[in-house]
Curated annotation (Swiss-Prot):
Expressed in leaves, stems, and flowers. This is Transcription factor bHLH75. The gene is BHLH75. The lineage of its organism: Eukaryota, Viridiplantae, Streptophyta, Embryophyta, Tracheophyta. One of its GO terms (molecular function) is DNA-binding transcription factor activity. The keyword Transcription applies.
């Protein structure tokens, strides 16, 4: 092995050359100068071969590199995890979307979601019922407004109820006084006997209940 005599740098200002003077065996000239491993590294005033383990001389550099690598890997894993979560969320939304949407061909200006469709069906049913009521109730028109139209319908129904009650009361009174099916009175008995008052009362009840003129018994009499 060829060795150079240490060059004496006695200036005392450069610790690099002072360390070389104290340790001349660090200089290795056996390796060819053209190879990258023949270069010497300097750390903390000491020359070392690039082929040797430099973890003792560069602990901060190695730890910094590992720390940066760990941070990069951690950030990359976080990004991948976040991207996978976003993709799963998007896939879940795509799978749930066809269940919520009702595929109905709507007209222009009309919505296609289920709530709007149900509301539209309800309004159509209400309009149909109102048209039926307009045909049944006299004096009921859609132009007068919903509230006024409902008031007219209510008044008409109440009037019908009152008429039904009144007619039922008159019919019950007439049936209580006279049983027309079992009435066995001759016309001669009515005018010859004392049943004239009863005949007049029967005519009055029939006129009120039926609304027509009762038959004239005197025209059928022979005298």
């Amino acid at each position: 092995m060829a060795r150079f005599e240490p060059y004496n740098y006695n200036n005392g200002h450069d610790p690099f050359f002072a360390h070389i003077n104290q340790n001349p065996e660090l200089i290795n000239l056996d390796l060819p100068a053209s190879t990258p491993s023949s270069f010497m590294l300097f750390s903390n005033g000491a020359l070392v071969d690039a082929n040797h383990n430099n973890s003792h001389f560069f602990p901060n550099l190695l730890h910094g590199n590992t720390r940066r690598k760990g941070n990069k890997e951690e950030s990359g894993s976080k990004r991948r995890r976040k991207r996978s979560e976003e993709e799963e969320a998007m896939n879940g939304d795509e799978t749930q979307k066809p269940k919520d949407v009702v595929h109905v061909r709507a007209k222009r200006g009309q919505a296609t979601d289920s709530h709007s469709l149900a509301e539209r069906v309800r309004r159509e049913k209400i309009n149909e019922r109102l048209k039926c009521l307009q045909d049944l109730v006299p004096g009921c028109y859609k132009a007068m407004g919903m509230a006024v139209m409902l008031d007219v319908i209510i008044d008409y129904v109440r009037s019908l109820q009152n008429q039904i009650e009144f007619l039922s009361m008159k019919l019950s009174a007439a049936s209580a006084c006279y049983d027309l099916n079992s009435l066995d009175i001759e016309p001669t008995d009515i005018f010859q006997g004392g049943n004239i008052h009863s005949a007049a009362e029967m005519e009055r009840i029939l006129r009120e209940s039926v609304g027509t003129q009762p038959p004239n018994f005197s025209s059928t009499l022979p005298f």
